[in-house]
């Protein structure tokens, strides 16, 4: 286990003692947010986050609000990035946590983590948590100035049920699972060696081949954008500088669920909102960017990977054309 942990730490540019094994990013997010805030009671109870976060972050923040914490959401710009000036305005002496996703799961927007970390240098009692679930293998990870970072191995072809929390070694957080600490005092329970080995292998493959994989996916994304832009009712929600693995769009006048179901009849799988969102509600991420409820309800997401082929894109475009003619005309 020590050798595997050393390997994971080396790949991430972290120290072995900064690696905490969890059951997934949802647990990692809960451990980081609740652990940081509970350990910072003597400083304050003010938290800053965004409307773009995964439901495990939103759920943890709601639980902390019930315990007396105050949560402010920083404004989102039209390109999907956070408004850094608004962040500066929201920061207070009693702010103990800023929680931001590195890459938004619905739009693919890459947040300016380094700039955020630089701003927080003037607030030594405030910790920065980054949910990097959608970032590994898709963009460069920024650990400098980050106190905790959640990682979900199944997003880069590791196993479901495994997760990581990278925690700065001098940071003290409150554990959420109590008992005998096996590899860390911050998360009780003995990690599964097989799971840990799968994380290291998947992480190594993702990072060693990252540039080639990104270039392949970017070419497919450009092809999709060029072809889908020919349809007058198509509106792209993902910004141009998003990670190419995620392409969020809306077809005006057609609910995203309708398109999802019609494409599903042709064995094409697309997503409406994030997988862990409440069914029947609009996409908070798309609404935060577009400020348009109808557009948010019409949105859906295409996910690409280095395993996606041009032939699959061509087949998708043929199926999309049939669905568009049936639903949008």
Q: How would you label these PLM feature ranges?
A:
Residues 1-329:
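Pyridoxal 5′-phosphate
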């Amino acid at each position: 286990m020590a050798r595997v942990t050393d390997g994971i730490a080396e790949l991430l540019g972290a120290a072995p003692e900064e690696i905490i094994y969890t059951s997934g990013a949802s647990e990692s997010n809960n451990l980081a947010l609740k652990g940081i805030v509970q350990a910072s009671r003597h400083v304050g109870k003010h938290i800053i986050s965004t409307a773009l976060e995964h439901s495990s972050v939103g759920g943890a923040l709601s639980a902390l609000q019930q315990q007396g914490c105050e949560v402010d959401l920083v404004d989102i710009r039209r390109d999907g990035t956070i408004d850094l000036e608004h962040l500066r305005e929201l920061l207070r002496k009693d702010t103990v946590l800023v929680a931001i996703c590195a890459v938004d799961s619905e739009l693919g927007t890459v947040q300016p983590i380094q700039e955020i970390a630089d701003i927080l240098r003037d607030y030594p009692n405030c910790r920065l948590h980054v949910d990097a679930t959608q970032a590994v293998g898709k963009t460069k990870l920024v650990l400098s100035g980050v106190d905790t970072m959640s990682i979900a191995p199944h997003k880069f072809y590791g196993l479901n049920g495994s997760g990581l929390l990278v925690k700065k070694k001098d940071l003290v957080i409150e554990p959420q699972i109590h008992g005998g600490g096996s590899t860390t005092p911050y998360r009780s329970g003995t990690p599964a060696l097989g799971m840990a080995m799968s994380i290291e292998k998947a992480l190594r493959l993702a990072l060693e081949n990252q540039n080639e994989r990104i270039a392949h996916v970017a070419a497919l994304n450009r092809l999709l954008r060029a072809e889908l832009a020919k349809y007058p009712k198509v509106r792209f929600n993902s910004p141009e500088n998003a990670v190419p693995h995620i392409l969020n769009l809306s077809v005006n006048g057609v609910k995203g669920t309708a398109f999802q179901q019609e494409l599903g009849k042709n064995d094409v799988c697309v997503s409406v909102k994030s997988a862990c969102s409440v069914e029947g509600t609009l996409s908070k991420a798309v609404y935060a960017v577009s400020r348009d409820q109808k557009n948010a309800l019409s949105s859906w997401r295409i996910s690409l990977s280095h395993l996606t082929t041009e032939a699959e894109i061509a087949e998708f475009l043929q199926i999309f054309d049939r669905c568009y003619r049936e639903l949008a005309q």
